[in-house]
UniProtKB/Swiss-Prot annotation:
Transcription is among the record's keywords: no
Cysteines paired by S-S bonds: none
Active site annotation, chain numbering: 313 (proton acceptor)
Top enzyme class: transferase
PROSITE patterns linked: EPSP_SYNTHASE_1, EPSP_SYNTHASE_2
Name of this chain's protein: 3-phosphoshikimate 1-carboxyvinyltransferase
Record-linked InterPro entries: Enolpyruvate_Tfrase_dom, Enolpyruvate_Tfrase_sf, EPSP_synthase, EPSP_synthase_CS, RNA3'P_cycl/enolpyr_Trfase_a/b
Gene3D superfamilies reported in the protein's UniProt record: Enolpyruvate transferase domain
Binding-site residues, phosphoenolpyruvate: 25, 98, 126, 171, 346, 387, 412
Pathway(s) of this molecule: Metabolic intermediate biosynthesis; chorismate biosynthesis; chorismate from D-erythrose 4-phosphate and phosphoenolpyruvate: step 6/7
């Protein structure tokens, strides 16, 4: 993937735009996993409509094909069938995709052949050891404690009860739950340690498992029990990626304009309520119907205090908004210590880049304190992180001369980002 330097366009007038956001990465990759499990159980072919096509989802598709499954595209619909039959020397490239890194190893454990996992250099710093230890606890031999590692499948997994510290990533829990119904005894996952971040993503996993006919008991806090059984083949419909939509909604707040996201679901498996709670802190007017969400901004909003533990992936966009608040106002972002293990150390990256442009951003043990100050032109580094690149675009709406050093990082979850962003601003000025 090439590095593309990009001059962030300025919103010289209030943004007025309707934007259609492609499908959710989180939902797409969970649907692919459940479709693969249904096929592997002999339940038949699944289809996925509205699937996101991005680097992360292509890596997931490639991983499933490496395991012997068939993933085909007919128009805008993905079709998944086949069996788990990896060849000798099978190797899964995780890239920088946490969902591939943490969802596919339990699936590979159902293979009768060993499967090796590796990824981008930055991926080698991402937490994975707790998941590998959990697989070992369920009777799966695993060579290695981090990338690269090898899962020594035997064709089946006994399952049982396992304790895991998922305080670094909720994906540890989701990865086990997705495959648990295919394990002989099912799985009971007990989280130990500090609160699990991004809990809505576990809720998404549980909801989608139930939609596939899997019995999940999550009635006890920090414990999830999945009974052994079939995973139904079905047609999945993927929602627009609401997390990616936040950057575009931020444009309304920053410019005093109006942005409408078409296709915003009235009810969602994504953390829509968390997103709305953040938007309301920005002195905006929100209008939601069955078919869209519209935000009207006022250009002026004060700093805010927000716990982002459940939606840590929004932190770069929220930090950019905090940096553009009323000068002198202070924002506190907390509950996000786990972001140090994301695509990059997002707390350090945000502090560095905001301060590079003349801002005032301080790291705390679990977040950031940002005092809004006038920013100056300069290079905003993306660190190969899609969320960091989008944050630079938000800053550039208000600050002329912001150069995002790698807008291509957005290919991870939204390859169309530069064009969608340019079109949004073009419609506003044209």
């Amino acid at each position: 993937m090439s590095i593309e330097s990009w001059t962030a366009p300025v919103a010289s007038t209030p943004v007025q735009a309707n934007v259609t956001i492609p499908g959710s990465k989180s939902q797409t990759n969970r649907a692919l996993m459940l479709a693969a499990l249904a096929a592997a159980q002999g339940q038949g072919t699944s289809t996925i409509g509205g699937a996101l096509r991005s680097r992360d989802t292509e890596l997931m598709i490639s991983a499933l094909r490496t395991l012997g499954l068939h993933v085909d595209e007919a128009g805008s619909v993905l079709t998944v069938n086949g069996r788990i039959t990896p060849g000798e020397d099978a190797q899964v490239d995780c890239g920088l995709a946490g969902t591939v890194l943490r969802f596919v190893p339990p699936l590979a454990a159902l293979s009768a052949n060993p499967v090796t996992f590796d990824g981008d250099e930055q991926a080698r710093a991402r937490p994975i050891t707790p998941l590998l230890d959990a697989l070992r606890g369920l009777g799966v031999p695993v060579d290695g404690v981090g990338l690269p590692f090898q899962v020594q499948g035997s064709g089946s997994v006994a399952g049982g009860t396992v304790a895991i510290d998922a305080s670094a990533s909720s994906q540890f829990v989701s990865g086990l739950l997705l495959c648990a119904a295919s394990f002989t005894q099912g799985v009971t996952v007990q989280h130990t340690g500090s609160p699990v971040p991004s809990a809505p993503h576990i809720a998404m996993t549980v909801m989608m498992l139930r939609q596939a006919g899997v019995q999940v008991d999550d009635s006890v806090g920090n414990r999830w029990q999945v009974r052994p059984g079939t995973v139904a083949a079905r047609h999945w419909v993927v929602e627009p990626d609401l997390t990616n939509a936040v950057a575009f909604l931020a444009a309304a707040a920053v410019s005093g304009g109006t942005v409408r996201i078409t296709g915003w679901p009235k009810t969602s498996v994504q953390p829509a309520d968390n997103i709305l709670n953040i938007l309301f802190r920005l002195n905006v007017v929100v209008n939601q119907t069955d078919s869209f969400l519209e935000v009207q901004g006022s250009t002026v909003y004060d700093g805010f205090d927000v716990d982002l533990r459940d939606v840590g992936e929004l932190t770069p966009s929220v930090a950019a908004l905090a940096a553009l608040a009323t000068p002198g106002s202070v924002s506190q972002l907390h509950g996000i210590a786990h972001l140090r293990g994301h695509e990059t150390d997002r707390l350090a990256a945000l502090s560095t880049e905001i301060n590079r442009l003349g801002g005032d951003c301080q790291e705390t043990s679990d977040g950031l304190i940002i005092t809004a100050t006038p920013l100056r032109p300069g290079v905003w580094r993306a660190y190969a992180d899609h969320r960091m690149a989008m944050a630079g675009a938000i800053v550039g709406l208000r600050v002329s001369g912001v150069e995002v050093d790698d807008i291509g990082a957005t290919h991870k979850t939204l390859p169309q980002f530069p064009q969608l962003w340019a079109n949004m601003l073009k419609r506003s000025t044209g």
